[in-house]
Regions:
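Non-cofactor substrate-recognition interfaces
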Residues: 28-39, 45-263
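Active-site cores that bind ATP or allylic diphosphates and position pyrophosphate for catalysis
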Residues: 1-39, 46-48
Length: 263
């Protein structure tokens, strides 16, 4: 339908995904200061709990940057596309970071594993490794795409090709469901299969967000100025030292032509 996409101003987040140090990733740790992270940007932080992969571009050049986390001041090293370094490390910041000379092509990272960003629910299958995606660009973001197979056609396609499991929950009827139900909220714990919850869900961490709507427009009980789920997730990541940049960003977002609400 015409007019279904509209420009909206939302909270965006560049998240830090901690690289697992093992035989596959060891060479990327040479000379690293602090922890090593992949940086990935999203305009929909509410999808981050459903992340199961990161995608790099097949022909994109990547570099490591020694820096400090902007919110915690912890020394760290981050990986992002060389072309996008100026978007995150400006001339005003000179002296606080070091871009390394060594350049890596995207496929060199294929198979490298990272820690789950928000371990609320564990996936039922192989996840949390870097894959190559043919649609990854350096138009914006970091040149590394956060993959949530349950919330994007491209994400689902490349994840399937790479054998990456989507993050499903199992409801009381025994059906696999995305973490967000048809009304636009995270499933409540009591709506999920108890055996699944016991085995795969961290009730303490997930319980804080269970039942929350991903868009405030769907919750009539909220005040107009109530913080959004996107904001709360970004703030939680910031406090945990897992966010690199949080900002407002204007982007095109689909809206229902009947209700005029975001989908």
């Amino acid at each position: 339908q015409p007019g279904c996409y509209r420009d909206v101003k939302d909270t965006t987040c560049t998240a830090q995904f901690r690289v697992v140090r093992d035989e596959r990733s060891e060479r990327f740790f040479e000379g690293v200061e602090g922890e090593l992270y992949f940086l990935a940007w999203t305009t929909t932080p509410w999808t981050l709990p459903s992340n199961t992969a990161l995608a790099v571009g097949p022909a994109i050049d990547y570099v490591r940057v020694k820096c400090r986390n902007p919110y915690t001041d912890e020394a760290q090293t981050v990986i992002l596309a060389r072309e996008l370094v100026p978007s995150y490390f400006t001339k005003k910041m000179e002296g606080t970071f070091e871009v390394e000379d060594r350049v890596y092509k995207g496929p060199e990272f294929e198979g490298v594993r990272y820690e789950q960003l928000l371990p609320w629910v564990r996936p039922m299958g192989d996840a949390f490794r870097v894959i190559v995606g043919d649609y990854v660009t350096t138009t914006d973001g970091t040149g590394i795409v956060h993959i949530a197979p349950t919330f994007g056609a491209d994400d689902n396609r490349v994840a399937k090709q790479a054998g990456i499991a989507p993050l499903f929950v199992i409801d009381r009827a025994g059906k696999e469901q995305p973490m967000v139900d048809r009304t636009g909220k995270f499933f409540r714990i009591e709506e999920l299969d108890p055996a699944f919850v016991e085995r795969y869900v961290d009730a303490g961490k997930y319980g804080e967000y269970a039942g929350r709507y991903v868009k405030n427009a769907y919750d009539d009980t909220l005040a107009p100025d109530a913080p959004t789920l996107d904001v709360d997730i970004a703030v939680a990541l910031k406090g945990a030292g897992m966010a690199f940049k949080i900002e407002k960003h204007v982007h095109s977002y689909p809206h229902c032509w009947r209700t005029d609400k975001p989908v």
